[in-house]
Amino acid sequence: MCNPTVIVAHPGRQHSFRVAKALKEGGLLFRYVTTVYNKDDSLLMRFVKLFLNKDSFQRASKRKCPGLDDNDVIQFCELEGILLLALQRIDFTRILSNKVQRYVTNKFQRKLANYVIRNPQIEAVISYDTNSSVLFSILKDKVPHVKLIMDNAHPNRHYLYHSYHENWGCVGDFSKTL
Protein backbone atom coordinates (compact mmCIF):
# COMPACT_ATOMS: atom_id res chain seq x y z
CA MET A 1 0.00 0.00 0.00
CA CYS A 2 1.68 3.20 -1.11
CA ASN A 3 -1.23 5.49 -0.23
CA PRO A 4 -3.07 5.57 3.09
CA THR A 5 -5.98 3.28 2.39
CA VAL A 6 -6.97 1.66 5.69
CA ILE A 7 -10.15 2.49 7.57
CA VAL A 8 -10.52 1.82 11.29
CA ALA A 9 -14.16 1.67 12.33
CA HIS A 10 -15.92 1.28 15.65
CA PRO A 11 -19.30 2.74 16.62
CA GLY A 12 -18.07 3.04 20.20
CA ARG A 13 -14.47 3.52 21.16
CA GLN A 14 -12.83 0.42 22.63
CA HIS A 15 -9.10 0.44 21.73
CA SER A 16 -9.74 1.60 18.17
CA PHE A 17 -8.19 5.00 18.97
CA ARG A 18 -4.82 3.35 19.49
CA VAL A 19 -5.03 1.37 16.26
CA ALA A 20 -6.03 4.45 14.27
CA LYS A 21 -3.26 6.52 15.83
CA ALA A 22 -0.64 3.84 15.06
CA LEU A 23 -1.83 3.56 11.45
CA LYS A 24 -1.70 7.33 11.06
CA GLU A 25 1.84 7.42 12.42
CA GLY A 26 2.73 4.73 9.88
CA GLY A 27 1.11 6.69 7.07
CA LEU A 28 -1.60 4.09 6.40
CA LEU A 29 -4.77 5.58 7.89
CA PHE A 30 -7.39 6.70 5.40
CA ARG A 31 -10.07 7.54 7.98
CA TYR A 32 -11.16 6.67 11.50
CA VAL A 33 -14.93 6.11 11.48
CA THR A 34 -17.11 6.23 14.60
CA THR A 35 -20.40 7.57 15.94
CA VAL A 36 -19.59 10.00 18.76
CA TYR A 37 -16.37 11.99 18.55
CA ASN A 38 -15.49 15.28 20.22
CA LYS A 39 -14.63 17.30 17.12
CA ASP A 40 -13.78 20.96 17.67
CA ASP A 41 -16.42 22.11 15.18
CA SER A 42 -19.23 19.76 16.29
CA LEU A 43 -22.28 21.85 17.15
CA LEU A 44 -24.13 18.79 18.41
CA MET A 45 -21.38 17.91 20.92
CA ARG A 46 -21.20 21.53 22.09
CA PHE A 47 -24.96 21.54 22.64
CA VAL A 48 -24.96 18.20 24.46
CA LYS A 49 -22.09 19.28 26.74
CA LEU A 50 -24.20 22.20 27.99
CA PHE A 51 -26.47 19.73 29.79
CA LEU A 52 -23.88 17.35 31.21
CA ASN A 53 -22.73 17.11 34.80
CA LYS A 54 -19.01 17.28 35.57
CA ASP A 55 -18.39 13.52 35.29
CA SER A 56 -20.32 13.14 32.03
CA PHE A 57 -18.67 16.28 30.62
CA GLN A 58 -15.23 14.79 31.27
CA ARG A 59 -16.29 11.49 29.69
CA ALA A 60 -17.56 13.32 26.60
CA SER A 61 -14.34 15.33 26.36
CA LYS A 62 -12.32 12.10 26.29
CA ARG A 63 -14.03 11.01 23.09
CA LYS A 64 -11.16 12.47 21.12
CA CYS A 65 -7.82 11.01 20.14
CA PRO A 66 -4.89 13.43 20.50
CA GLY A 67 -3.02 11.67 17.68
CA LEU A 68 -5.79 12.25 15.11
CA ASP A 69 -6.85 15.44 13.37
CA ASP A 70 -10.56 16.13 13.12
CA ASN A 71 -10.19 15.70 9.35
CA ASP A 72 -9.11 12.09 9.91
CA VAL A 73 -12.45 11.28 11.56
CA ILE A 74 -15.77 10.53 9.89
CA GLN A 75 -18.92 10.19 11.95
CA PHE A 76 -22.00 8.16 11.09
CA CYS A 77 -25.11 8.03 13.31
CA GLU A 78 -23.82 10.70 15.71
CA LEU A 79 -27.20 11.62 17.15
CA GLU A 80 -28.18 7.98 17.62
CA GLY A 81 -24.81 7.32 19.27
CA ILE A 82 -25.29 10.17 21.74
CA LEU A 83 -28.81 9.00 22.55
CA LEU A 84 -27.49 5.47 23.08
CA LEU A 85 -24.80 6.71 25.48
CA ALA A 86 -27.43 8.59 27.48
CA LEU A 87 -29.72 5.57 27.52
CA GLN A 88 -26.94 3.29 28.73
CA ARG A 89 -26.44 5.58 31.74
CA ILE A 90 -30.09 5.24 32.84
CA ASP A 91 -31.24 1.81 31.59
CA PHE A 92 -29.85 -0.46 34.29
CA THR A 93 -31.71 -3.51 32.99
CA ARG A 94 -30.05 -3.03 29.57
CA ILE A 95 -33.18 -4.37 27.85
CA LEU A 96 -33.93 -1.22 25.85
CA SER A 97 -30.33 -0.08 25.48
CA ASN A 98 -29.29 -3.45 23.99
CA LYS A 99 -32.02 -3.14 21.34
CA VAL A 100 -31.04 0.44 20.56
CA GLN A 101 -27.37 -0.56 20.42
CA ARG A 102 -28.13 -3.30 17.87
CA TYR A 103 -30.08 -0.78 15.78
CA VAL A 104 -27.31 1.85 15.91
CA THR A 105 -24.58 -0.72 15.23
CA ASN A 106 -26.39 -2.17 12.20
CA LYS A 107 -27.17 1.28 10.79
CA PHE A 108 -23.54 2.33 11.34
CA GLN A 109 -22.26 -0.77 9.54
CA ARG A 110 -24.55 -0.20 6.53
CA LYS A 111 -23.49 3.45 6.22
CA LEU A 112 -19.83 2.47 6.52
CA ALA A 113 -20.24 -0.23 3.86
CA ASN A 114 -21.73 2.32 1.46
CA TYR A 115 -18.85 4.70 2.18
CA VAL A 116 -16.27 1.99 1.44
CA ILE A 117 -18.07 1.01 -1.78
CA ARG A 118 -18.05 4.66 -2.95
CA ASN A 119 -14.30 5.02 -2.25
CA PRO A 120 -12.45 2.51 -4.44
CA GLN A 121 -9.02 3.53 -3.10
CA ILE A 122 -9.78 1.84 0.25
CA GLU A 123 -7.86 -1.42 0.47
CA ALA A 124 -8.64 -2.57 4.02
CA VAL A 125 -11.20 -2.10 6.77
CA ILE A 126 -10.47 -2.86 10.42
CA SER A 127 -13.62 -3.40 12.44
CA TYR A 128 -14.31 -4.85 15.86
CA ASP A 129 -15.98 -8.12 16.96
CA THR A 130 -19.78 -7.76 17.09
CA ASN A 131 -19.63 -4.57 15.04
CA SER A 132 -18.51 -6.38 11.90
CA SER A 133 -21.06 -8.94 10.69
CA VAL A 134 -23.35 -6.70 8.60
CA LEU A 135 -20.42 -4.63 7.32
CA PHE A 136 -18.37 -7.65 6.27
CA SER A 137 -21.26 -9.45 4.59
CA ILE A 138 -22.01 -6.37 2.44
CA LEU A 139 -18.37 -5.67 1.58
CA LYS A 140 -17.61 -9.32 0.82
CA ASP A 141 -20.22 -9.24 -1.95
CA LYS A 142 -19.83 -5.68 -3.26
CA VAL A 143 -16.06 -5.07 -3.02
CA PRO A 144 -14.31 -8.43 -2.65
CA HIS A 145 -10.86 -6.86 -3.18
CA VAL A 146 -11.11 -4.97 0.14
CA LYS A 147 -9.34 -6.80 2.96
CA LEU A 148 -11.61 -7.28 5.97
CA ILE A 149 -9.84 -7.35 9.32
CA MET A 150 -11.72 -8.08 12.52
CA ASP A 151 -10.04 -7.11 15.76
CA ASN A 152 -11.44 -8.90 18.77
CA ALA A 153 -10.78 -7.42 22.18
CA HIS A 154 -12.17 -10.54 23.87
CA PRO A 155 -10.55 -13.60 22.30
CA ASN A 156 -12.12 -17.02 22.64
CA ARG A 157 -10.94 -18.59 25.91
CA HIS A 158 -11.20 -22.12 24.57
CA TYR A 159 -8.90 -21.24 21.65
CA LEU A 160 -6.43 -19.47 23.94
CA TYR A 161 -6.35 -22.45 26.31
CA HIS A 162 -5.51 -24.90 23.51
CA SER A 163 -3.02 -22.54 21.88
CA TYR A 164 -1.31 -21.96 25.21
CA HIS A 165 -0.94 -25.68 25.91
CA GLU A 166 0.19 -26.51 22.37
CA ASN A 167 2.96 -23.93 22.57
CA TRP A 168 3.94 -24.52 26.20
CA GLY A 169 7.26 -26.12 25.34
CA CYS A 170 8.27 -23.44 22.83
CA VAL A 171 8.79 -20.74 25.43
CA GLY A 172 11.38 -22.58 27.54
CA ASP A 173 12.10 -21.34 31.06
CA PHE A 174 9.56 -18.54 30.74
CA SER A 175 6.74 -21.11 30.93
CA LYS A 176 7.74 -21.95 34.51
CA THR A 177 6.85 -18.42 35.60
CA LEU A 178 3.27 -18.74 34.35
Predicted regions, residues:
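A conserved catalytic-core segment of Leloir-type glycosyltransferases
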Residues: 2, 37-107
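Short N-terminal targeting/anchoring amphipathic segment
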Residues: 6-10, 74-75, 113-132, 139-141, ...
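Acceptor-binding helix/loop patch of EC 2.4 sugar-transfer enzymes
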Residues: 48-49, 77-100, 146-178
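N-terminal low-complexity, Ser/Thr- and acidic-residue-enriched intrinsically disordered segments
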Residues: 5-51
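Short, well-ordered alpha-helical microsegments
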Residues: 15-18, 132-136
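Aromatic-acidic/polar surface patches that form glycan- and anion
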Residues: 9-13, 101-105, 128
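Short, polar loop motifs at secondary-structure junctions
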Residues: 36-38, 130-133
